[in-house]
């Protein structure tokens, strides 16, 4: 987030203190920090409550969950922080979410794909998920006993610029969630990792239409038809009423040859044509072919062996460039 490094005083003062979270180096080692948490009844009860709240199985080690809540900049030794867990969780999270988007919306432009991926795996999205889980960032005035069960990070003064060794609230929450995800993969396996992502991350509803930049729909539809070797789109009136009244309604269809690409309804011919072109583009780009299995379903490994699938893998059906499915 490069904008945080701006030095304008007005900009720095306009951001609330709660939007920052800075990590300080703890004097005690990471090992003793984890041992203190595991040996405290208050601490272990809070961590266990979090474990049950997010649906982790009993076989998920408490030590790993505690370690996932200690950010990598809190302790110098990565063996006792969530640095390695976070790295593993990020790799599998990005891989599976990107695979899901590519299979569900194969025609979606790359900008929209990155937008949806950020909507599920970005700092803001995972920070909201942390709020749903009940995760909090440790406050500056809290002691170690009160911080058990929270992400170990402290708020920073908004007048201070970001320095090495500092992170912010959203990033701290994101690292903690991805570290928990990495622990799921290490101790539960690939199948449970995918289930965890489906239950907690992909369960958030995202509309792919909001990711598309369609500022000039008629021009963009014309270029799309040319790229797909289709006839130039023509706009025809399908129905109308009240042309000479105060509230006319026009229904316009966008045609490529004899094929209806889409239709729009508005109070003027120009707006109706724009809406018809927009709906045609939306229908093309968010086309979602049905599929039963993802390619990663055939990467499941049990005891070092890849089991035979119950049915042969069929690739995601893609429509050829000469067709338009509306």
Curated annotation (Swiss-Prot):
Domain RNase III: residue ranges: 47-189
Organelle targeting peptide span: 1-26
One example of a Gene Ontology biological process annotation: mitochondrial translation
Subcellular location: Mitochondrion
InterPro entries membership: dsRBD_dom, Ribosomal_mL44_DSRM_fung, RNase_III_dom, RNase_III_sf
Gene Ontology molecular-function annotations: double-stranded RNA binding; ribonuclease III activity; structural constituent of ribosome
GO terms under cellular component: cytoplasm; mitochondrial large ribosomal subunit; mitochondrion
Keywords, comma-separated and alphabetical: Mitochondrion, Ribonucleoprotein, Ribosomal protein, RNA-binding, Transit peptide
Main localization of the protein described in the UniProt heading: mitochondrion
Signal peptide as annotated in the record: none
Residue ranges constituting the DRBM domain according to the UniProt record: 216-286
SMART domains: DSRM, RIBOc
Matching CDD domains: DSRM_MRPL3_like, RIBOc
Superkingdom classification of source: Eukaryota
Gene3D superfamilies tied to this protein: 3.30.160.20, Ribonuclease III domain
Physiological role: Component of the mitochondrial ribosome (mitoribosome), a dedicated translation machinery responsible for the synthesis of mitochondrial genome-encoded proteins, including at least some of the essential transmembrane subunits of the mitochondrial respiratory chain. The mitoribosomes are attached to the mitochondrial inner membrane and translation products are cotranslationally integrated into the membrane.
Sequence similarity: Belongs to the ribonuclease III family. Mitochondrion-specific ribosomal protein mL44 subfamily.
Subunit structure and binding partners: Component of the mitochondrial large ribosomal subunit (mt-LSU). Mature yeast 74S mitochondrial ribosomes consist of a small (37S) and a large (54S) subunit. The 37S small subunit contains a 15S ribosomal RNA (15S mt-rRNA) and at least 32 different proteins. The 54S large subunit contains a 21S rRNA (21S mt-rRNA) and at least 45 different proteins. mL44 forms a heterodimer with mL57 and stabilizes rRNA expansion segments 1/2 at a membrane-facing protuberance close to the point of attachment of the ribosome to the translocon in the membrane.
Protein name as catalogued: Large ribosomal subunit protein mL44
Species, as recorded: Schizosaccharomyces pombe (strain 972 / ATCC 24843) (Fission yeast)
Gene from which the chain derives: mrpl3
């Amino acid at each position: 987030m490069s904008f945080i490094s701006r030095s304008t005083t007005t900009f720095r003062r306009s951001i609330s203190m709660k939007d920052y979270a800075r990590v300080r180096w703890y004097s005690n080692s990471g090992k003793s920090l984890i041992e203190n948490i595991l040996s405290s009844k208050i601490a272990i009860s809070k961590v266990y409550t979090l474990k049950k709240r997010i649906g982790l199985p009993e076989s998920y080690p408490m030590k790993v969950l505690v370690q996932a809540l200690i950010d990598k900049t809190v302790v110098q030794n990565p063996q006792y922080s969530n640095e390695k867990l976070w790295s593993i969780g990020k790799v599998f999270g990005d891989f599976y979410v990107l695979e899901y988007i590519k299979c569900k919306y194969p025609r979606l432009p790359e900008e929209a794909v990155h937008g949806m991926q950020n909507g599920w795996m970005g700092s803001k999205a995972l920070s909201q998920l942390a709020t749903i889980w009940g995760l909090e960032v440790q406050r500056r005035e809290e002691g170690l006993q009160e911080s058990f069960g929270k992400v170990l990070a402290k708020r920073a003064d908004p007048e201070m610029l970001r320095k090495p060794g500092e992170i912010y609230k959203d990033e701290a929450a994101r690292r903690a969630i991805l570290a928990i995800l990495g622990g799921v993969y290490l101790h539960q396996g690939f199948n449970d990792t995918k289930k965890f992502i489906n239950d907690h991350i992909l369960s958030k509803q995202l509309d792919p239409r909001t990711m598309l930049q369609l500022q000039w729909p008629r021009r963009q539809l014309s270029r799309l038809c040319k790229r797909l070797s289709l006839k130039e789109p023509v706009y025809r009136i399908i129905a109308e009423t009240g042309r000479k009244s105060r509230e006319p309604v026009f229904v316009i269809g966008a045609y490529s040859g004899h094929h209806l690409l889409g239709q729009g309804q508005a109070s003027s011919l120009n707006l109706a044509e724009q809406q018809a072109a927009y709906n045609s583009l939306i229908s093309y780009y968010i086309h979602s072919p049905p599929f039963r299995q993802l390619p990663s379903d055939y990467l499941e490994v049990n005891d070092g062996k890849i089991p035979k699938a119950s049915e042969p893998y069929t690739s995601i059906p893609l429509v050829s460039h000469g067709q338009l499915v509306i």
